[in-house]
Amino acid sequence: GLKEIFKAGLGSLVKGIAAHVAS
């Protein structure tokens, strides 16, 4: 559903930001 897609996108976004901040 839409919520699952949103959660997946948000999760990858958070991971990307976390990786950017950590490096």
UniProtKB/Swiss-Prot annotation:
Its main location: secreted. It is found in: Secreted; Target cell membrane. One of its GO terms (cellular component) is other organism cell membrane. The modification Serine amide is found at residue 23. The lineage of its organism: Eukaryota, Metazoa, Chordata, Craniata, Vertebrata. Belongs to the frog skin active peptide (FSAP) family. Alyteserin-1 subfamily. One of its GO terms (biological process) is innate immune response. The keyword Oxidoreductase does not apply. Expressed by the skin glands. Antibacterial peptide with amphipathic alpha-helical structure that shows selective growth-inhibitory activity against Gram-negative bacteria but low hemolytic activity against human erythrocytes (LC(50)=145-220 uM). It is moderately active against the Gram-negative bacteria E.coli (MIC=25 uM), K.pneumoniae (MIC=50 uM), P.aeruginosa (MIC=25 uM), A.baumannii (MIC=6 uM), and is weaky active against the Gram-positive S.aureus (MIC=100-250 uM). Keywords: Amidation, Amphibian defense peptide, Antibiotic, Antimicrobial, Immunity, Innate immunity, Membrane, Secreted, Target cell membrane, Target membrane. This is Alyteserin-1c. It comes from the Eukaryota.
